[in-house]
């Protein structure tokens, strides 16, 4: 049961990251605003 929960959380995290990268492809940190970082063209939310 615990393994299934961890797997589901990882799947959700990957889906969110893929969704963000498709919607908000970026070139530098200035395009992402104060709550995100641009890493290799992908928007990653930070806190």
Curated annotation (Swiss-Prot):
Propeptide: 22-27
One term under GO cellular component: extracellular region
Keyword hit for Secreted: yes
Residues recorded with modification Isoleucine amide: 46
Keywords: Amidation, Disulfide bond, Secreted, Signal
Segments forming a coiled coil: none
Described function: Leech salivary gland peptide with unknown function.
Misc note: Does not show effect on voltage-gated calcium channels, potassium channels, and tetrodotoxin-sensitive sodium channels. Does not show activity on Nav1.7/SCN9A, and shows very weak activity on cation channel TRPA1.
Protein name: Peptide HSTX-IX
Organism, as annotated: Haemadipsa sylvestris (Indian leech)
């Amino acid at each position: 049961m615990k393994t299934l929960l961890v797997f589901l959380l990882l799947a959700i995290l990957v889906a969110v990251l893929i969704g963000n990268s498709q919607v908000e492809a970026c070139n530098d940190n200035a395009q992402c605003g104060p709550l995100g970082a641009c890493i290799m063209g992908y928007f990653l939310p930070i806190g």
